[in-house]
Amino acid sequence: IINIEDNIEFNKLYKARDLYENKTILLKVINHNNHICEDFLANLIDESTIIREINSPYILNMIDVGVDYREDGIWYYMIYEYEKGISLNNIIEGNYLHLEAIISIATQILKGLEAAKEHGMYHGDLNPSNILVDKWYNVKILNFGVTKANHGVNIRSGNNIKYLSPHQLCINYTDTESDFFALGLILFECIFKKLPFGESYDEEQMLKFIDKGINFNALKGINGNEELIEIIKKLLNRTEKYSEFREVILDLSSIMYEKAEIKESLLIEDEQNYKYETKTKVTKNRNKLLLISAIIIIILSALTTLII
């Protein structure tokens, strides 16, 4: 192990060195808990094969999985190809994310989820610690297959239930709707630096928070993000909601298209103003030259008359 890339309790990501292959890798370690089923590892091996078949540029490629029995407990590990970047939760905590960056990150996550769905997969544990982002805002998603390998039950690493959907909390059922809901939470956090329903380690309490809803009127930082907030509302809505990842991608694209149109119109306006100002300046300079020429002619005429 070279260093810790990300450190969430009982859910650690390390930068490590594969001594056999002599290459740098990422190592994800999960501590065993009561939510993890007996055949989890065998199922995870099968899921890792499917993940490799997906071959999406937005999903971090899983090389191997295994288990380590130690005195302090059972630790499952997943070996990934090395990619530079930091987890999205570190970016959210430390930086202001502009609208274009948020939309770019969200679009890439959606494309990864869409590719997985085409292979009959969902994520089921989507949260900022499982999203790797580089300095150009390129995204790689980790932990695909973990929830599915656990028979659709989220493993709740470190008792983290903040990003679970209502039906995951209520009946331990996971599907693509869980990923829509988790993405809504992540996007909300990207804008407001906090989760919409608060935090709790108690599942019943978390459900009560969700049932209470969100008072968007009390939030600061909405200006300029209205269109994105409408998408977030639909992602978190339990009735009028998205059914396809492509729908969300199109809605996000329309925001960027509108921004591009506004920017283009401003550029055209600036260009027109520049041309007008340049033309006005040229006209004024020409008039000045004509006036100076006329004065010179008058002076020369007067001097000629005096000499004669």
Where are these regions (language model features)?
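Protein kinase catalytic-loop region centered on the HRD/HxD motif
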Residues: 111-121
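Conserved end of the kinase activation segment
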Residues: 167-177
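AlphaC helix of the eukaryotic protein kinase fold
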Residues: 35-53
